[in-house]
Amino acid sequence: MQKFEFFEHTADIGIRAYGRNLNEAFENAAVAVFEVMTDTSKVEPKEMREVKIDGYDLENLLYRWIESLLVYYDSEIMLFSKFYVNIDEKNLTLEGKAWGEKFDPNKHERRTVVKAMTYHEMKIENKGNYYILTFVVDI
């Protein structure tokens, strides 16, 4: 199963992330967002950042997860390539970890900066044996 794919969206970037379970789909969504910004295969997991959030539904958890990671990019110029997510669906909480390193122009390709997460076209689908997360990021 592929981890993610991009889809056409006027002036923004649409992402479909896949996972065998909800945690893996959220992890792959994060990889996709950072793949928009750089080649994540060149981002070494040198430093770890933690994210602990709650939400009012799964879509809000997805929004807040990606938003939290973008805050690290905006404040510390951190790029991430490896993620761990544990979602408590009953209590709508997410505990996550992201590993990466600070942007280095000599090492990391500069692609399109993701400015923000959006709710536009957001959808979380449980297909039984896998999940599909669809969302759009503002560039």
Curated annotation (Swiss-Prot):
The keyword Plastid does not apply. GO terms for molecular function: calcium ion binding. SUPFAM superfamilies: MTH1598-like (SSF69819). InterPro entries: Archease, Archease_arc, Archease_dom, Archease_dom_sf. It holds the Pfam family Archease. Ca(2+) binds at residues 12, 138-139. Keywords: Calcium, Metal-binding, tRNA processing. GO terms for biological process: tRNA splicing, via endonucleolytic cleavage and ligation. Belongs to the archease family. Activates the tRNA-splicing ligase complex by facilitating the enzymatic turnover of catalytic subunit RtcB. Acts by promoting the guanylylation of RtcB, a key intermediate step in tRNA ligation. Can also alter the NTP specificity of RtcB such that ATP, dGTP or ITP is used efficiently. This is Protein archease. It comes from Sulfurisphaera tokodaii (strain DSM 16993 / JCM 10545 / NBRC 100140 / 7).
